[in-house]
């Protein structure tokens, strides 16, 4: 049986309070992924399973207590750890939804011209937006705002995304 691939769902940023809570930069839409067992990974170490004892939201961000982490000192040791879940535990999505990790490596085509812009190298996210980091065939990096008016279609079967870039955006990155 093939081992499941791990998918990054968050980053442990800092302790919160004195009782072992850890602030999480959380990349998923559903907090249910923070129930039960998750995996933590530091650097090149293998992911290790940890049990989520409790989770609550504070100022729009999850605060998590892991089993065996009972104070601020223990929580501090988790700073910078990546939180993962096995890919095969992710819920099924609706037909018009995708997981961000599924976008990595797909071709990006400019709708107006049909021109191949490049390949999505990675996805950067913050509290406000999702940015596709696209690598062109010439090796240039394009930061593309993955907002509804600009992303027209994503076809995972053909591994392509059709975009309508805002006026002038590509000139910033592609002009010599």
From Swiss-Prot:
Coiled coil: none annotated. Residues 95-169 form the PRC barrel domain. The keyword rRNA processing applies. Signal peptide: none annotated. It holds the Pfam family PRC_RimM. It is found in: Cytoplasm. The keyword Repressor does not apply. Gene3D superfamilies: PRC-barrel domain (2.30.30.240), RimM (2.40.30.60). The PRC barrel domain binds ribosomal protein uS19. PANTHER family: RIBOSOME MATURATION FACTOR RIMM. Belongs to the RimM family. This is Ribosome maturation factor RimM. It comes from Nitratidesulfovibrio vulgaris (strain ATCC 29579 / DSM 644 / CCUG 34227 / NCIMB 8303 / VKM B-1760 / Hildenborough) (Desulfovibrio vulgaris).
């Amino acid at each position: 049986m093939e081992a499941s691939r791990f998918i990054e769902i968050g980053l442990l940023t800092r302790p919160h309070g004195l009782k072992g809570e850890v602030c999480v930069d959380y990349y998923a839409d559903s907090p249910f992924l923070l129930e039960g067992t998750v995996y933590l990974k530091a650097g090149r170490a293998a992911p290790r399973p940890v049990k989520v004892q409790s989770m609550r939201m504070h100022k729009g961000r999850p605060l998590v207590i892991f089993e065996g982490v009972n104070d601020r000192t223990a929580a501090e040791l988790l700073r910078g750890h990546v939180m993962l879940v096995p890919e095969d535990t992710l819920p099924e999505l609706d037909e018009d939804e995708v997981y961000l990790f599924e976008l990595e490596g797909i071709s990006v085509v400019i709708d107006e011209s049909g021109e191949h812009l490049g390949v999505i190298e990675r996805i950067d996210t913050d509290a406000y937006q999702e940015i596709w980091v696209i690598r062109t065939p010439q090796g240039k990096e394009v930061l593309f705002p993955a907002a509804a008016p600009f992303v027209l279609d994503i076809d995972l079967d053909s591994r392509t995304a059709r975009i309508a870039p805002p006026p002038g955006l590509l000139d910033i990155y592609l002009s010599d």
